[in-house]
C-alpha cells in the first residue's frame, strides 16, 4: 500500500494502533498477517526509513477490534522481535476498564476487566489445551453478538451474549460441535446455559509466548459483533465503505 494513514472523522483514532519494534525486513503483508484475525483492516501505514527501526500504524474498521489487537499483540514475539502495540499517544485517552494504551513494559493487569457484561451466559466445556479466548469468541459468534468471552486452565470457558435469543441459539446449534483452535487442535465441545452465577471461574489459562504466530493471550474480551467467516480479511482504502456483517 502507499500513502499515509487515513484520518477520518473525530474519534476515529480509537480504530488506529501503533506497532513498534518491527524487524528491518518487515513488509506490509507481514503486518497484515499479524493483525487480520482481529477484524477488518482499513489501512496499514508502514514506516521503514533508512537508519531507523520500522514501525507501522494499523487502522481497523471497528474500535473494538483495535482494542482486541492491542491486548492480543502487545509483547508478541514475532521472529525474535517483541512487538510494541499500543494506541497512539495522541489518540484515545484510556482503555476500557481503566488504564491507558500502555507503554513499554506496562503490566497487562492495569487494563482491568471489560466493563460490559451480560446475564445471557453459557458455559463451554471440552476445549482443547491450545484453545484461546479469541478462538472461543470466533466460534460462538456464529450464534450471535458476543459481549464477553474467557477460557480457563481446565478446558472450560464462559461466553456471554448481548441477547437472550443468541444464547438460546448457541445452546441449540453449537452444542456438541467441532471446535478448532488457532493451533489446529480440534475437539467436540459442550455448550450449556449457565445456572446461578458460579462463585468463581478461577484463573484464566496462562500461556507462555512462543515464536509461533498464535493468538495465545487468554485475557477476556468485550463486545464484538458476529462476523461472516467468508468476508475478506483486508479491505483496501478505496473500499472503505464496506459494512460489517
Curated annotation (Swiss-Prot):
<dbReference type="Pfam" id="PF00076">
    <property type="entry name" value="RRM_1"/>
</dbReference>
<feature type="compositionally biased region" description="Basic residues">
    <location>
        <begin position="204"/>
        <end position="245"/>
    </location>
</feature>
<keyword id="KW-0677">Repeat</keyword>
<keyword id="KW-0508">mRNA splicing</keyword>
<dbReference type="InterPro" id="IPR034520">
    <property type="entry name" value="SRSF1_RRM1"/>
</dbReference>
<feature type="region of interest" description="Disordered">
    <location>
        <begin position="89"/>
        <end position="116"/>
    </location>
</feature>
<feature type="compositionally biased region" description="Gly residues">
    <location>
        <begin position="91"/>
        <end position="106"/>
    </location>
</feature>
<dbReference type="GO" id="GO:0016607">
    <property type="term" value="C:nuclear speck"/>
</dbReference>
<feature type="domain" description="RRM 2">
    <location>
        <begin position="120"/>
        <end position="194"/>
    </location>
</feature>
<dbReference type="InterPro" id="IPR000504">
    <property type="entry name" value="RRM_dom"/>
</dbReference>
<keyword id="KW-0507">mRNA processing</keyword>
<dbReference type="InterPro" id="IPR050374">
    <property type="entry name" value="RRT5_SRSF_SR"/>
</dbReference>
<feature type="domain" description="RRM 1">
    <location>
        <begin position="15"/>
        <end position="90"/>
    </location>
</feature>
<dbReference type="GO" id="GO:0003729">
    <property type="term" value="F:mRNA binding"/>
</dbReference>
<comment type="similarity">
    <text>Belongs to the splicing factor SR family.</text>
</comment>
<dbReference type="GO" id="GO:0000380">
    <property type="term" value="P:alternative mRNA splicing, via spliceosome"/>
</dbReference>
<dbReference type="InterPro" id="IPR029538">
    <property type="entry name" value="SRSF1_RRM2"/>
</dbReference>
<keyword id="KW-0539">Nucleus</keyword>
<dbReference type="GO" id="GO:0005737">
    <property type="term" value="C:cytoplasm"/>
</dbReference>
<keyword id="KW-0963">Cytoplasm</keyword>
<protein>
    <recommendedName>
        <fullName>Serine/arginine-rich splicing factor 1B</fullName>
    </recommendedName>
</protein>
<dbReference type="InterPro" id="IPR012677">
    <property type="entry name" value="Nucleotide-bd_a/b_plait_sf"/>
</dbReference>
<dbReference type="InterPro" id="IPR035979">
    <property type="entry name" value="RBD_domain_sf"/>
</dbReference>
<feature type="region of interest" description="Disordered">
    <location>
        <begin position="192"/>
        <end position="245"/>
    </location>
</feature>
<keyword id="KW-0694">RNA-binding</keyword>
<comment type="function">
    <text>May play a role in preventing exon skipping, ensuring the accuracy of splicing and regulating alternative splicing.</text>
</comment>
Amino acid at each position: 500500500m502507499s500513502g499515509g494513514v487515513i484520518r477520518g472523522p473525530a474519534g476515529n483514532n480509537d480504530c488506529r494502533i501503533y506497532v513498534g519494534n518491527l524487524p528491518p525486513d518487515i513488509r506490509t503483508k507481514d503486518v497484515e498477517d499479524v493483525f487480520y484475525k482481529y477484524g477488518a483492516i482499513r489501512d496499514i501505514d508502514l514506516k521503514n526509513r533508512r537508519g531507523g527501526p520500522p514501525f507501522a500504524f494499523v487502522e481497523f474498521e471497528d474500535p473494538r477490534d483495535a482494542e482486541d489487537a492491542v491486548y492480543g499483540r502487545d509483547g508478541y514475539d514475532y521472529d525474535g522481535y517483541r512487538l510494541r502495540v499500543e494506541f497512539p499517544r495522541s489518540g484515545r485517552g484510556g482503555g476500557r476498564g481503566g488504564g491507558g494504551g500502555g507503554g513499554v513494559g506496562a503490566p497487562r493487569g492495569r487494563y482491568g476487566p471489560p466493563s460490559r457484561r451480560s446475564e445471557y451466559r453459557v458455559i463451554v466445556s471440552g476445549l482443547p489445551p491450545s484453545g484461546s479466548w479469541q478462538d472461543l469468541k470466533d466460534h460462538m459468534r456464529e450464534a450471535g453478538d458476543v459481549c464477553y468471552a474467557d477460557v480457563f486452565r481446565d478446558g472450560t470457558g464462559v461466553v456471554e451474549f448481548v441477547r437472550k435469543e443468541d444464547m438460546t441459539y448457541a445452546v441449540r446449534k453449537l452444542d456438541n460441535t467441532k471446535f478448532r483452535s488457532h493451533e489446529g487442535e480440534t475437539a467436540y465441545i459442550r455448550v450449556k446455559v449457565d445456572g446461578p452465577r458460579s462463585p468463581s471461574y478461577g484463573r484464566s489459562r496462562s500461556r507462555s509466548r512462543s515464536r509461533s504466530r498464535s493468538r495465545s493471550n487468554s485475557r477476556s474480551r468485550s463486545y464484538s459483533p458476529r462476523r461472516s467467516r467468508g468476508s475478506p480479511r483486508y479491505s483496501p482504502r478505496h473500499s472503505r465503505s464496506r459494512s460489517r456483517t
